[in-house]
């Protein structure tokens, strides 16, 4: 079956037998690019032979067009001299920017000579006839003249592809292709005059590279949606934090190893905290519980937060009225060697529930709801120790192909923390590393792929967090 343009080209070649692609394009009013592609199709169908040639073409530059219109500089110089000697400054004033070019080419062609500051003509008249003819018809020009014009940047040389197309097989019967089969064509029988296009029902639809979210960003948004659906409100805080919220309010002693330089990023300068009552309560609780002299200056040091629990600590410090259910998703920063499983900045999800009579059993049920929502149906809990919760558990989820994998840490907030913020209700908290969770759920072996920028890779990535899996 032949398309409309294929038929046009074959009918034209039936008369001409042979023609260039450029000629076909002009005569049939078909874009030259379409002629190239249609020629390839007709060649594959055995109707034509295609011979490709490369030819050199010359084009006038803007300067070349100016010379054709205004004349060559050396012509102007000879005309100004009019067979008489003249001073250089006088000619320079009249010729302007063309003066240097005119002197150079006039000397090279033997039209003038220079004596001190005087230009002496050697000819009375001069016309650059050969150069002008070469600009008009460069293909027939003398090689030396042509090279001169190229050197003077009056012409540019281009290599063009020319297709010569020759008919080798006449089509037995040419029927135009029918794109739309209408009821009228069926009723009248007109459809028989056309070739019906065959359809490949197994062919894939065309691919359109439309914009899409980065797959890890989409993963984070799905987690946010899940937490909101479970009745949690999202809270935020800055990356730069004071140690008070990152450690002290969470009953982490000032000599704890996690506060050393190799486990957190320090920032020069000090922060501020105006809640003197809260500062004094934290001081008393630390000195009573850990038996050391608590230093407020240490707690005011700036750092890049090492855990998003610093955000929920700020919620606690605001002394909220129960019931409250909040979560935060954000970046945290810890010194480490970057490899397939470690980064120095990564994402965490922290949650906090404050309710009257909230029990450890309620906490485990909440965690099970969250992980079921992510798509992890089998959950186990293992007793653990964390500085700011008691009792505490580690959460393990069963991942296909990997078995039981640690997913999160959780527990009821220690009474020392609740005492510091004057909250009498029970509170449960948990935190999980989102980047490693994403690696497990998305089947990645390198954590760095979560931040990939390769367009093809991102285009083909999919995100599936399905509670029904």
Swiss-Prot record:
SUPFAM superfamilies: Class II aaRS and biotin synthetases, Winged helix' DNA-binding domain. It catalyses: tRNA(Phe) + L-phenylalanine + ATP = L-phenylalanyl-tRNA(Phe) + AMP + diphosphate + H(+). Disulfide bonds: none annotated. It is an enzyme of class 6 (ligase). Its EC number is 6.1.1.20. CDD domains: PheRS_alpha_core (cd00496). Its main location: cytoplasm. Binds 2 magnesium ions per tetramer. L-phenylalanine binds at residues 309, 348-350, 388. Gene3D superfamilies: Bira Bifunctional Protein, Domain 2 (3.30.930.10), Winged helix-like DNA-binding domain superfamily/Winged helix DNA-binding domain (1.10.10.10). NCBIfam families: pheS (TIGR00468), PRK04172.1 (NF003210). Belongs to the class-II aminoacyl-tRNA synthetase family. Phe-tRNA synthetase alpha subunit type 2 subfamily. This is Phenylalanine--tRNA ligase alpha subunit. It comes from Sulfurisphaera tokodaii (strain DSM 16993 / JCM 10545 / NBRC 100140 / 7).
């Amino acid at each position: 079956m032949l398309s409309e343009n294929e038929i046009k080209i074959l009918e034209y070649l039936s008369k001409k037998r042979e023609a260039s692609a450029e000629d076909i394009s002009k005569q049939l009013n078909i874009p030259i690019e379409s002629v190239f592609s249609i020629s390839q199709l007709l060649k594959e169908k055995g109707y034509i032979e295609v011979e490709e040639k490369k030819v050199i073409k010359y084009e006038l530059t803007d300067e070349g067009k100016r010379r054709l219109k205004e004349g060559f500089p050396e012509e102007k110089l000879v005309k100004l001299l009019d067979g008489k000697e003249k001073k250089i400054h006088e000619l320079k004033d009249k010729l302007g920017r063309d003066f240097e070019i005119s002197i150079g080419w006039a000397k090279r062609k033997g039209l003038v000579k220079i004596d001190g500051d005087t230009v002496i003509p050697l000819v009375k008249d001069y016309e650059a006839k050969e150069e002008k003819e070469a600009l008009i018809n460069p293909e027939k020009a003398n090689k030396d003249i042509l090279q001169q014009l190229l050197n003077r940047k009056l012409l540019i040389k281009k290599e063009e592809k020319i297709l010569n197309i020759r008919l080798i097989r006449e089509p037995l019967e040419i029927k135009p292709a029918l794109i739309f089969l209408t009821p009228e064509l069926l009723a009248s029988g007109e459809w028989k005059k056309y070739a019906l296009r065959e359809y490949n029902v197994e062919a894939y639809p065309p691919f359109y590279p439309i914009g899409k979210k980065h797959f890890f960003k989409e993963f984070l948004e799905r987690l946010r949606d899940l937490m909101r659906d479970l009745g949690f409100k999202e809270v935020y805080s800055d990356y730069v934090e004071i140690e008070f919220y990152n450690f002290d309010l969470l009953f982490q002693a000032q000599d704890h190893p996690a506060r050393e330089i190799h486990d957190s990023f320090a920032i020069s300068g000090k922060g501020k905290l105006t809640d003197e009552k809260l500062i004094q309560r934290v001081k008393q609780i630390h000195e009573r519980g850990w038996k050391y002299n608590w230093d407020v200056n240490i707690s005011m040091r700036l750092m890049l937060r090492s855990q998003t629990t610093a955000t929920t600590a700020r919620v606690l410090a605001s002394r909220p009225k129960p019931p409250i259910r909040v979560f935060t998703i954000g970046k945290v920063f810890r010194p480490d060697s970057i490899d397939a499983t470690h980064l120095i900045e990564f994402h965490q999800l922290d949650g906090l529930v404050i309710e009257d009579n909230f029990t450890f059993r309620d906490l485990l049920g909440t965690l099970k709801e969250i992980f079921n929502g992510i798509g992890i149906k089998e959950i186990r809990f293992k007793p653990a120790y964390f500085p700011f919760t008691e009792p505490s558990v580690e959460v393990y989820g069963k991942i296909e192909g990997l078995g039981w994998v640690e997913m999160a840490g959780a527990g009821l907030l220690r009474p020392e923390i609740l005492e510091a913020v004057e909250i009498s209700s029970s509170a449960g908290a948990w935190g999980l590393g989102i980047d490693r969770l994403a690696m497990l759920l998305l089947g990645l072996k390198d954590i760095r792929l979560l931040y990939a920028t390769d367009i093809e890779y991102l285009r083909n990535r999919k995100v599936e967090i399905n509670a029904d899996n």
